[in-house]
Amino acid sequence: MKRRTLLGLGILALALGLTACNGGKEKSAQGDSKQEADSGKGNEKANAKANEDYFEWMGEDSIANLNEEGSKQKVIVIPKRAKSFDSGLGPDDDVQLEELYFESDDDFQLGYGLTLLKKVKKIVLPKNQTSEVDVQSDHNLESLDIPAGVSSIAKFGFRDCQSLKEVNFLGEQLKVIPDSAFLNCSALEKISIPNSVESIEEAAFQDCKSLKEVHMPKNLKEIGSGAFAAAPVDSYYFPKEIENLKVLPDSFASTGKGNFYVVKDSWLDKNFEDVFGILGEKQYYDGE
């Protein structure tokens, strides 16, 4: 009887051990699957491959357009062979492109190549991009990082990017936000302008209907005609370093009376009425 009891206990222990082992394997498999899924997040470029056969080429290293097969692709990586766009990838209604990457991190001559892409939601520019950026009329583009080396964006460079909510400037090389650069970016909610910028030109942020918060650059010298016209900004932040700022009577036309935050005892604090008149309400902040 004692032997039977011991034998029964042994079998039970073995069964429990096997169950625990299988459960551990299942958890391990689930963990491995989750790790694989997590490692894929934000790594779309690694999962896509450059294919030179998706393009029509002009010479050895310039892309003229997408061919029929390329137009069907939702994700495209520009091959490292390419150095420039000869024309543009759009605006053909048959172009299905939603995400665009570059195989090389080297500077790329964009020209008008990334404009009028009606369905594109995501563009990742080369890390070492320095040439001018122009993505106007990319209606579904949601965000864009401007690489640190970029020193200019085109006039009308983001015009009519109506889904654009976020622009991140990763460096401080820009001197000018040019004419109509963000005209009618109706989803843009907030922007921090690089401290290197000295001039915000005519209609730069006009008709940005969702824009609520603007952080001005330290080296700002002038704000052009209609720069923020019809943009209902609640809060503008002006760093203490700003001096001798020139503002036109219509720089903030049809915006309502926003809050203009300045640092106490700064040049703008002391000259607020001369610079802004009745354009906005003076408020104070700590400059951070």
For the regions a protein language model found, what residue spans apply to each?
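Secretory targeting signals
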Residues: 9-15
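N-terminal export leaders
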Residues: 3-7
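Structural signature of tandem-repeat unit edges
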Residues: 52-55, 70-84, 93-109, 116-131, ...
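Post-signal peptide N-terminal segment of mature Sec-exported envelope proteins
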Residues: 29-58
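Eukaryote-biased recognition of intrinsically disordered, low-complexity regulatory segments
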Residues: 60-71
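C-terminal motif of bacterial Sec signal peptides marking the signal peptidase cleavage site
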Residues: 17-20
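Bacterial signal peptide processing site
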Residues: 22-25
